[in-house]
Amino acid sequence: MMMTDLPENIRKTAVALLRLGEATAEDIAKITGRKRSTESYYLNLMADLKLVKKKKVGRKIYFIFNSRDQEKRQ
């Protein structure tokens, strides 16, 4: 799946994650201006599609693009 295939609302989340590299839903929300819960929902949808992976550190969950997907975009 290409970035352009994503709906606009999820694409905004994806672009923010690309800028940050690795981020929590709260980090993404600061960039997009949307609620943390909204970003969490979109990030989890992207995880379900195997576009991003989750990394739990303590109580925080960080999201990062899968390496294979990142290579396709470059």
UniProtKB/Swiss-Prot annotation:
A GO molecular-function descriptor: DNA-binding transcription factor activity
Tree of life domain: Archaea
Protein biosynthesis in keyword set: no
Keyword Signal attached: yes
Alphabetical keyword list: Signal
Signal sequence segment: 1-25
Pfam families tied to this protein: TrmB
Protein name: Uncharacterized protein AF_0529
Source organism per UniProt: Archaeoglobus fulgidus (strain ATCC 49558 / DSM 4304 / JCM 9628 / NBRC 100126 / VC-16)
